[in-house]
Amino acid sequence: MLARLLGRLGQSVLVLLVVSMVSFLVFRYIGDPTVSLLGEDASVAEREALLHELGFDQSVPVQYAGYLKQVLSGHFGISYRFRQPVTEVIASRVPATVELSLAAALFAVVGGVGLGVYTAMRRRSLVSRTIMGVSLVGVSLPTFLIGIGLIYLFSVELKWLPAFGRGTLVDVGGWQTGLLTVSGLSALVLPAITLGFFKLTLIMRLVRTEMLDVLRSDYIRFARARGLRNATLYGRHALRNTLIPVITIIGLQLGSLIAFAIVTETVFQWPGLGLLFITSIQGVDVPVISAYLLMIGLLYVGINLVVDLLYAWADPRLRRR
């Protein structure tokens, strides 16, 4: 187990180095910082002075080493658009994206696992067939179209839920949250469903497929022949062995929620990292773009590591290796 952990840590470091190189190339070669910071009317001397201050007149290896040093110290430069440190700009948007992603993850995991188990246990019922039919919508339709449809139904026609924004926020130790207000919770419903719906249908279909395979196995037939109750049979034996092979896929899918939040946040004008990334691309705010890419890479590496550990915990055979 320790050797497996050390091996995964080594792989994670290598992946992060590659991501940092890509982030550095974006930071160095996309856009012109002199135009963004000084404007088009700046003189040649002013441009050269700024390039010297930013270190762009040095060799590429020296610049990359300096970039790594800045990243490790938590400094990503100054946002061209906001004229603030990138860390402050990103930190102000983190609560919105984290709350949206957690709500979508909860919706996807609880709904996906629950519906997957139900449709496997009652696979011939009309309800199960209806659920499987509806799941095709989540797999087929793009996220932005689902979001627009929910906005039209629940915001325009029924007027039950807001169509954009986060609602009323409360400051809790510097964390701007909408989870403590009614308007904040109501504003979270549609974006969370939109972001998590595809993941829910994917998890549901995966769990259903694995559950059906487990229920056909010999040890389940033997347990049923011994007279075990259905609650024990499904909950203790079938479900545990069903989740082992899908833990990795579920973890990776949930890890992509923050990255996929770009579309959802744009549709609902949710003031999170995804919307910040889109506006940064439109405004060629390269430091923010670079920091966002590096952060997403770090997130994926961290989630992969956690998923591997969970997989080893769930499967005793891996713990003995």
Language-model features: locations:
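Alpha-helical transmembrane segments of integral membrane proteins
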Residues: 2-4, 16, 94-127, 143, ...
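Hydrophobic secretory-pathway targeting helix
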Residues: 2-22
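Residue-level recognition of pore/gate-forming positions within transmembrane alpha-helices
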Residues: 12, 20, 43, 108-109, ...
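Hydrophobic alpha-helical transmembrane segments of membrane transport/permease proteins
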Residues: 15-65, 154, 158-180
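Membrane-water interface segments at the C-terminal ends of transmembrane alpha-helices
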Residues: 22-30, 58, 67-69, 134-165, ...
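Short hydrophobic, aromatic-rich alpha-helical segments embedded in or entering the lipid bilayer
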Residues: 44-75, 220, 269-280
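Membrane-interfacial helix-loop-helix junctions in multi-pass membrane proteins
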Residues: 52-60, 77-86, 168-188, 281-287
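An internal, D/E-rich "acidic patch" concept
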Residues: 57-113
